Amino acid sequence: LQYLHVSLWEFDKKIRRGGDTAQTRMQFIHERINGKLPLIGVGNLFTADQILAAYETGWAEFIALGKTVMINPHIATQIREGREDEIETQLDSTRTDHYGFPDTLWSSTSSGTQSWLPPVKGAEWKPMDI
């Protein structure tokens, strides 16, 4: 095993059972592996501030982005060039050509009803609470 990639609905979600419920799951895992391998963490980080805050916790050596990259395919460049104000946190269903999704994925995504997909402007979205 070269690394551990932990994908959570929320990066800073607290432990529910089997441990200190005041501690986050990511922090618990990081402490448990104790530097034996790098930890990659992900979990609904949509803005540059959220990404930086997650990294600065020290709970993960690397931060991964899932839904955020679907919405902003060039997010690394946007952050590097100081264009954080251009980062979108919701899909715009009127910009079909902007995202480059295959038709089936676009159909599922633009409906805004799947919490495992990015939020859509004008649609209620709430991450799953698991």
Where are these regions (language model features)?
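Flavin-dependent oxidoreductase catalytic cores
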Residues: 1-130
